[in-house]
A protein has these predicted regions:
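Flexible glycine-/small-residue-enriched beta->alpha junction loops
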Residues: 99-138
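Active-site capping/gating regions of soluble enzymes
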Residues: 2-63, 67-69, 85-105, 110-113, ...
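Short, well-ordered beta-to-alpha junction loops that form the rim of enzyme active sites
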Residues: 180-182
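Active-site cofactor/substrate anionic-group-binding motifs, chiefly glycine-
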Residues: 77
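Cap/lid and interdomain-hinge subdomains that line or gate substrate/regulatory clefts
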Residues: 123-159, 165, 169
Length: 418
């Protein structure tokens, strides 16, 4: 029987493999409120390389958390942002694959392949009524060719990666996500429909898809953009997915995936409204927010924990250019707002926590400070055992913050009636 992901799934990241139990505790709390959300632990190849962790460690930590909390529902391990070059080491430990074809978006496929694909979907040419979208979609052969030129090559690559994994691990043994979010502008409903048709033609049993949304999804901070426009795009995407599932025989549980979804408080209510209205499912990835709760918990514990949290910031500040470079498109740091490390050295635990904890209404909250630390996990990785020992020493404080952050600020506003 094929592996089918549940309606609501929640991507969690545990960079240093110490917070699995605390993360799962938040999911358990949601279950106690009658909301079934399943955890998906995800860690990219880049994160493994930065930290120096073994790929198997993600599965080991997830399984240990599940055993410790006696969790008897599903859980998954996501090989996040994989491509053909790096997939092999993930094959033994993953049952969810986020196929990243960003590099192929915008690269035209062969003209003959584009024409053959467009010829295979004549039903999309003309005026198309999609239930849930106010206006009919107007599509011409020319507009479909244009979309195919931009995305078909990427979908073909996704098909190649999917078939490689299926050949190695067996069909139906894993969840497939196709990531289309790393492109310049959001896909329009006609574009998303063409992409989904192409995915169906490739025979990819896609269960989650990550389109590009309007606005900025910066790391660890709130959504920046037009919330009303986001809500319209989100609802339109849900409508297109429902239509494509029926039209092209895609998996019935196909749902949207929101990347960099942690801390996007402004859009949680619009997402919840849309899910309630349509009955749709959701996958949301919240990887990096937990590492910041480790720093908050360490600082809150005071003493050595606070000293170490200050040291992490001082190192991140000194190496900010190198740390920020790989994340340049998904951070927005005002260097004038970054406090001098000497100033931070004199802070109390409360001052450090207030600057870092994501409470946008708190007068001491510092978005730039938070974003720099978000991308600065490499500084903690370089500390090696010293950092890991601090996680153990400050476990009570850290666990409490990790669970509270995921439950109160993420799961509750997204899935639980207030």
């Amino acid at each position: 029987m094929a592996l089918i992901i549940e309606k609501f799934s929640f991507g969690v990241g545990d960079r240093f493999a110490h917070q699995g139990k605390a993360q799962l505790a938040a999911i358990v709390k949601a279950a106690e409120q009658g909301v079934e959300v399943v955890p998906v632990w995800n860690k990219s190849n880049r994160e493994h390389q930065t930290i120096g962790s073994e790929i198997a460690s993600c599965r080991q930590a997830a399984d240990a958390a599940v055993k410790a909390l006696d969790w008897n529902k599903s859980h998954y391990v996501d090989a996040y942002h994989i491509n053909l070059k790096i997939v092999d080491p993930f094959l033994d430990n993953s049952d969810f694959y986020t196929i990243d074809v960003a590099d192929a978006i915008g690269t035209p496929a062969e003209e003959s392949e584009v024409n053959a694909f467009v010829d295979s979907i004549p039903e999309l040419i003309g005026s198309l009524d999609i239930p849930g979208i106010d206006q009919p979609l107007e599509m011409t052969r020319e507009s479909i060719v244009k979309t195919a030129n931009h995305y078909l090559k990427a979908v073909q690559l996704a098909g190649e990666i999917y078939r490689y994994i299926a050949d190695k691990n067996g069909e139906g043994t894993f969840i497939t996500e196709v990531s289309m979010d790393e492109t310049d502008s959001p896909q329009t409903p006609p574009e998303l429909l063409v992409i989904l048709a192409a995915i169906a033609k490739q025979g990819i049993p896609v269960q989650t898809i990550a389109p590009k949304f309007t606005g900025r999804f910066n790391k660890g901070v709130d959504y920046v953009g037009d919330v009303a426009q986001f809500e319209k795009e989100f609802q339109d995407d849900l409508a297109v997915i429902a239509f494509a599932v029926k039209k092209y025989g895609l998996p019935e549980n196909l749902k949207l995936s929101v990347h960099s979804g942690s801390d996007k408080f402004s859009i949680y209510e619009p997402i919840r409204r849309a899910l309630k209205k349509t009955g749709a499912g959701l996958h949301i990835k919240t990887a990096g927010t937990t590492w910041l709760e480790e720093l908050i918990g360490s600082a809150e514990a005071g003493g050595d924990g606070l000293d170490l949290a200050k040291e992490v910031y001082a190192e991140a500040f000194a190496n900010s250019e190198a740390l920020c470079a790989p994340y340049a498109t998904v951070i927005d740091i005002n260097t004038d707002d970054l406090p001098d490390p000497e100033t931070v050295k004199a802070w109390t635990a409360e001052q450090y926590v207030n600057a870092l904890r994501h409470d946008p209404n708190h007068p001491e909250f510092n978005s730039s400070f938070r974003q720099l630390l978000h991308v600065g996990y490499k500084t903690a990785a370089k500390m090696g055992d010293r950092y890991l020992k601090m996680l153990v020493k400050c476990e009570e404080s850290i666990s409490r913050n990790v669970t509270e952050n995921l439950y109160e600020r993420h799961l509750k506003p997204l899935f639980i009636d207030q």
